[in-house]
Design a protein with these regions (language model features):
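Short, structured segments at the rim of ligand-binding sites
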Residues: 1-138
């Protein structure tokens, strides 16, 4: 979510994320950087500097290495929703460890977003954003 915010977001005091199923701090910073985010790895977290002037994230699709970490895979599935281009998550079946139905429900969520944009967003905004989101729904 910090990629969507204006300004600087600091995640700190998260030492334990270095010793979970994977080094989640390192993997998050690596993959966010791969998607175009301005991320700085710190000892106990990371810093995200917004590249957006109007809170619209500036992320692009990428191949995400989740290192068989279910939480990383789910995080980047969500991040990929608003990225330009396709986001591919390697070994995404690792989510079955904690949330076996995640991707089925996720597809349903993407369909809700598509319906919302087609029904409630003005044609002016829809032209610019709907195509971007629709591209990521397929």
């Amino acid at each position: 979510m910090a990629c969507f915010a204006k300004g600087k977001t600091i995640i700190k005091d998260a030492h334990e994320l270095r010793v979970k199923e994977s080094d989640r701090i390192a993997i998050m910073t690596e993959n966010l950087t791969e998607m175009g985010a301005d991320v700085i790895d710190t000892d106990d977290g990371f810093i995200i500097n917004s590249r957006s002037e109007d809170s619209i994230p500036v992320l692009h699709g990428a191949e995400i290495n989740c290192s068989m970490d279910h939480r990383i895979a789910m995080t980047f599935a969500i991040a990929g929703l608003n990225a330009d281009g396709e986001t591919m998550i390697t070994d995404s079946d690792c989510v079955d460890v904690s949330y076996p139905g995640f991707f089925a429900q996720f597809r349903g969520f993407k369909q809700l977003i598509e319906r919302y944009f087609s029904k409630y967003v003005s044609p002016f905004m829809r032209k610019e954003y709907y195509e971007k989101i629709k591209k990521n729904l397929t």
